[in-house]
Design a protein with these regions (language model features):
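Short, small-residue-biased leader/transition segments that mark boundaries at the very start
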Residues: 1-6
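Active-site flanking loop/helix segments enriched in acidic
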Residues: 7-24
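Membrane-helix exit/interface motif
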Residues: 36-43, 61-69
């Protein structure tokens, strides 16, 4: 599922995605966004599932922050900030995937969000963009019932930068 695919080490070791809390958040966001994007195409049929996916993601974020020792007083504010960031990224990635601009908008969104703390993804950016497009196409072929059952097939992770 989306909760595991972000752990593929190739993203961190070969592509330079920061292997820290921010980088992990960005990779989770990329993959959860694709699942939610696909569920939106189902209309209201799987609206409850889409909400559950979102809720589980942020419940897990809350739990992870607590395990890292973030105080109870700070958790709400941190999760709210993460949710706001998530929505901004969803809009940017949707726009990038839908744009007919030879990938420019998606590349900019990836450089800004995924590689924002490292000064850009360089050669990795177009490869990760191609991976996202491949995942988006694969998920488009899934039925709503397959998604509801958690049967997701992801594109192979990029293997070389």
């Amino acid at each position: 599922a989306a909760s595991d695919v972000y752990k593929r080490q190739v993203f961190y070791q070969s592509y330079g995605v920061p292997d820290d809390l921010d980088g992990r958040f960005e990779m989770i966001t990329l993959h959860e966004h694709l699942v939610l994007r696909r569920l939106r195409r189902e209309g209201t049929r799987h609206a409850d599932l889409a909400q559950a996916v979102f809720d589980v993601m942020f419940t897990d974020m809350d739990r992870s922050l607590r395990l890292m020792g973030v105080s109870d007083i700070s958790i709400g504010k941190r999760v709210k900030t993460m949710a706001k960031a998530f929505y901004g990224r969803v809009a940017a990635y949707d726009g990038g995937l839908d744009a007919e601009d030879n990938g420019a908008a998606l590349h900019q969104a990836l450089d800004r969000n995924l590689f924002g703390t490292t000064g850009g993804g360089g050669a990795a950016t177009p490869l990760i963009a191609a991976y996202l497009r491949a995942c988006d196409r694969l998920l488009a072929d899934h039925s709503g019932d397959e998604l509801a059952a958690g049967r997701l097939v992801w594109a192979p992770a990029p293997t070389a930068a």
